Amino acid sequence: MLPIAILGGTFDPVHNGHLRVAWEAAEALDAQVRLMPAHVPPHKPAPLASAAQRVDMLERSLAGQSRLVVDTRELRREGASYTVDTLRGLRAEFGEAQPLILLVGADAFGSLPTWREWRQLFRLAHIVMLTRPGRTEPWSGELVGEAVPRRARSPRELQDTPAGKVLSIPVTPLDISASQVRALLATGREPRWLVPEPLLADPAILAPYRQQR
């Protein structure tokens, strides 16, 4: 069964680093990847762009292909965006047999014990770490105890079961950040080659970041 993977974030704005990671994960896992903009991230400042503006940027960026899609369920939920609630919603919608995958960076994986109901994440989905060459993150003892016995040897194992496996896949380390893009726009510069080309087609699309000046 084709897995459904989720990649969360504020996407404020979406940039080429987000899209490259999502595409590489889709190909490596033979999965549909859903990019999920967060409503109110628990550990980050509120986004500069509105929810509607961030969705519009994502939809423009993903036009013309079907492997990466936008999922707005977190924006429709009031309050903070907690991953465990999102996974419960996906599980209820797609059923117990559907393979679900949570995509996280290696740094985020290392911090899982600080997440709400973090042990439940392994019961609701597989967790795939997106790793970059030369970077390692320490794991706490409780995370080692939860994750190591769940390690998968190949993406195929994630297709054969609905949840509970841990896998690492390497991704291209594009050195791009949303804060970098926002800083360029705030000083009147263009983030060409850093953001998807459709975002540069109309000055109004990136206006929320230019208006910081």
Predicted region positions:
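Nucleotidyltransferase catalytic core that binds NTPs
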Residues: 1-213
